Amino acid sequence: MQLGIRLHDTKKLPFEERIANVHELGFVCGHLAPGKVISEFPTTDEALTPGLAMYMKNVFAKNQVDVAVLGCYLNLANPNPEQLAKITHRYMAHIRFASWLGCGVVGTETGAPNETYTAVPECHGEEALQTFITNLRPVV
């Protein structure tokens, strides 16, 4: 059996040290949410470049840790078209970055049909699900 961990649940250390620590703890894969794990360099959409992916991939490989999931947990059910466009752009950047990183999965959530990303009873309805599916299609 191989065990993985959400990297943002590990000891807060500089990126390279954190991944080495994950290996020392016995984990072989991790869930990477860049903004929650990395503080010493930017992880904005524009920063998610092939060069950054190559650097990070080498750090993971050196420590025998795979990236199992690249986390991008934003509200794809957001009803505000301007906010949704930014969210969609962020997902596209993460999907590209995941492919360069050698990660086959970008994590998401179904979201909430409001701008505040608040859990409300409407989150569990058919309309919310269809909104999510509609908004997910351009991303995948």
Locations of the language-model features?
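Boundary/entry segment of secreted carbohydrate-active catalytic domains
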Residues: 1-15
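Hydrophobic faces of well-ordered beta-strands that scaffold small-molecule active sites
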Residues: 3-7, 30-32, 67-72, 106-108
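Catalytic domains of carbohydrate-active enzymes, especially glycoside hydrolases
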Residues: 15-37, 101-105
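A short, structure-level motif marking secondary-structure boundaries and short turns
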Residues: 2-4, 39-43, 78-80, 123-125
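Active-site acidic/histidine proton-transfer and metal-coordination neighborhood
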Residues: 16-17, 54-63, 76-140
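Active-site-proximal loop/turn and secondary-structure-junction residues that shape catalytic pockets
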Residues: 9-11, 34-36, 74-76, 110-114
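Glycine-rich, positively charged N-terminal anion/phosphate-binding segment
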Residues: 35, 41-60
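Residue-level marker of alpha-helix boundaries and capping positions
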Residues: 8-10, 46-47, 85, 130
